[in-house]
């Protein structure tokens, strides 16, 4: 894997810097590395593809070295270099695709394609000169079963979940109380509602709670907490739990009271915040517990009192909500996030070449399914294919 990365890094630098008019002295070190790559690869044969509709391709390496010059690089020099670069780039691209479409239930962190296994041989280590990629660094750690750490921005840690629970219900669905939520990606939005605006509740207050368990532990997380849930701030028609009917939700938004968010690890509270909004942090956690209250306003203008009558019908429904958004965090496991295209890169290649469903990944690389059942086998394979996707993205956009 590290050899594949160094190949890609050398080719990217060569493609960017070996251009007509450049002083040879400015790229002499790069050309030496480029020639070392050619010397190492010459005389070797590889085969890629042969799975799904990914075509079989044979690769043979027999290229001349780039020479030295005291002057600027001319058009002939650059054209010779370009022909070599283009062939190598095509080769790396196909090795990456061949690796991204393969999976294994055992030792999925190790190379799975014949071409990448061959590149892992000792003689190709002479190519290796740069392991500065976070993915490569973590792949090497995971390969040795040592602690890894990926930094993510808006990590897709929450499987998609959108539903509701009713703490008070009746067949007519005209005086409901409960919670509804939407968890997806890096965000939780949860709302508590009471059609009667807590008129018969103790101290005219309703208590709500929402608990979310993560599939992986996050550390050093920067989080935004807001006293609102905008996705539940407009009227909607909702299917009943049994699917037999629908009910109407017409929210009027109040500010939540006694808001508390707890971050827990293995059942132990690590961080707690009370009535604190904006940016907060959590050291390490695998569970988030949100609790908040809906309090009937003790003093209301006539206009507000008209919204919340003392008896049915309740045409407007008192609602309070919270939004929790993970802006950045560190995780030992690889995840999809907002700043990278690895999941899309892997999925698009697998779809384009009609790769059959294997023993590890769900059909279509469905992320909700994948993260919900994030087994060690999936973790190993996902880290490998994401690492390869990061290498491919250096050369192919």
Swiss-Prot record:
Family affiliation: Belongs to the rotavirus VP6 family.
A single GO molecular function, which one?
A: structural molecule activity
- Chain sites annotated for binding Zn(2+): 153
Q: What else is known?
A: The VP6 trimer contains a zinc ion located at the center of the molecule. The zinc ion is not essential for either trimerization or transcription activity of the DLP. Zinc-depleted VP6 has an increased sensitivity to proteases.
GO BP, sorted A to Z: fusion of virus membrane with host plasma membrane
Annotated signal sequence is none
Instruction: Provide a GO CC annotation, any one.
Output: viral envelope
Q: Where does Ca(2+) bind?
A: 266, 286
Q: Does the keyword Calcium apply?
A: yes
Role according to the record: Intermediate capsid protein that self assembles to form an icosahedral capsid with a T=13 symmetry, which consists of 230 trimers of VP6, with channels at each of its five-fold vertices. This capsid constitutes the middle concentric layer of the viral mature particle. The innermost VP2 capsid and the intermediate VP6 capsid remain intact following cell entry to protect the dsRNA from degradation and to prevent unfavorable antiviral responses in the host cell during all the replication cycle of the virus.
Q: How is it modified after translation?
A: The N-terminus is blocked. Sumoylated with SUMO1 and SUMO2. Sumoylation of viral proteins seems to have a positive role on viral replication.
Q: Which Gene3D superfamilies match?
A: 2.60.120.170, Viral capsid alpha domain (1.10.1350.10)
Query: Matching InterPro entries, A to Z?
Result: Capsid_hemagglutn (IPR008980), Rotavirus_A/C_VP6 (IPR001385), Virus_capsid_a-hlx_vir (IPR008935)
Assembly mode: Homotrimer. Interacts with the inner capsid protein VP2. Interacts with the outer capsid glycoprotein VP7. Interacts with the outer capsid protein VP5*.
What protein am I looking at?
Intermediate capsid protein VP6
Q: Which parts of this chain are annotated as the region Interaction with the inner capsid protein VP2? A: 62-73
Sorted keywords for this record are: Calcium, Capsid protein, Intermediate capsid protein, Metal-binding, Ubl conjugation, Virion, Zinc
Name the lineage.
Viruses, Riboviria, Orthornavirae, Duplornaviricota, Resentoviricetes
Query: Which compartment or compartments is the protein found in?
Result: Virion
- The coiled-coil regions, if any, are none
